[in-house]
A protein has these predicted regions:
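Charged, often glycine-rich, active-site loop that binds/positions anionic groups
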Residues: 148-163
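Stable alpha-helical elements in mature extracytoplasmic
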Residues: 110-117, 121, 135, 150, ...
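Acidic helix-start/capping segments at beta-turn-to-alpha-helix junctions
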Residues: 134-151
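Second-shell loop/turn segments in exported
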Residues: 100-112, 139-141, 185-197, 230-231
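Extracytoplasmic cell-surface/polysaccharide-interacting catalytic and binding patches
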Residues: 33-130, 222
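Bacterial N-terminal signal peptides
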Residues: 18-27
Length: 232
């Protein structure tokens, strides 16, 4: 009788183990749905842009200069001077909100107000792309604070480079409208590209709204392929 009881107990234990392992595997498989690795397509909607870039972003150099002189730092002779300005300047670095060119004729410093404006533009642009069904892209900062040394070097390459520029006051930065930085999916899911023309339309909407709410002055730079932006 005892042998028979032991056999039944062993059978029941085995059945329980099988049932438990089956339940475990079902739970795990339902919790770990395979990630969709098909290409993430754009589903664009509600992209309007602005009627005219020149008219929408026509703030002239004098307007930029006037506010830059009021709220900015005094122009610097060299890069080493920027390091010593402590709380007056914020060093900007590529982050989740924006990408940066390797700056050859400027240095990555802005007054806190302009740094905050750049953060807002980058964040609003990403939000706007998401709302309009477009895959994420970052804006690219192409020029920031220029010292007297930077202007001298820039003039050798571009005779029109003005020594009298808002870039000298730490209030002003340029953002490309021709190039953007595609944000790749962290898990490697392929993402459909968004054309630079479409991205330019969305960026123009973001900038128009910030300009209308008196956050900045903006000049559309046709030759340089950028928006020239000064904090207010």
């Amino acid at each position: 009788g005892d042998v028979y009881k032991r056999q039944i107990m062993n059978c029941m234990k085995g059945a329980c183990c099988t049932l438990l392992s089956l339940l475990f595997s079902l739970t795990v498989s339902s919790g770990c749905k395979e990630k969709d690795m098909s290409m993430k397509m754009n589903e664009p909607h509600n992209i309007k842009g602005v009627i005219s870039y020149k008219r929408s972003f026509g703030d002239l150099n004098d307007t930029h200069l006037s506010v830059a002189k009021k709220i900015g730092i005094r122009p610097l002779a060299s890069r080493s001077e920027a390091e010593g300005l402590g709380g007056k300047l914020v060093q900007i670095k590529p982050c989740e909100r924006y990408a940066m060119d390797s700056l050859t004729h400027s240095i990555p410093f802005l007054i806190p107000q302009a740094s905050a404006l750049l953060d807002t533009i980058g964040a609003n642009f990403l939000d706007s792309l998401s709302c309009k069904g477009l895959n994420p892209n970052q804006i690219i900062v192409t020029s920031v604070l220029r010292t007297a040394d930077d202007v001298k070097r820039l003039r050798r390459r571009n005779g029109n480079a003005s020594a009298n520029s808002a870039h000298a006051f730490g209030t002003t930065f340029d953002v490309s409208y021709r190039r953007f930085c595609k944000v790749e999916d962290p898990d490697g899911r392929p993402m459909q590209d968004v054309s630079p023309d479409t991205l330019k339309l969305v960026l123009a909407e973001v900038l128009r709204d910030l300009r209308k709410s008196d956050k900045c002055y903006i000049k559309y730079e046709l030759k340089q392929g950028c928006f020239h932006i000064t904090a207010r």
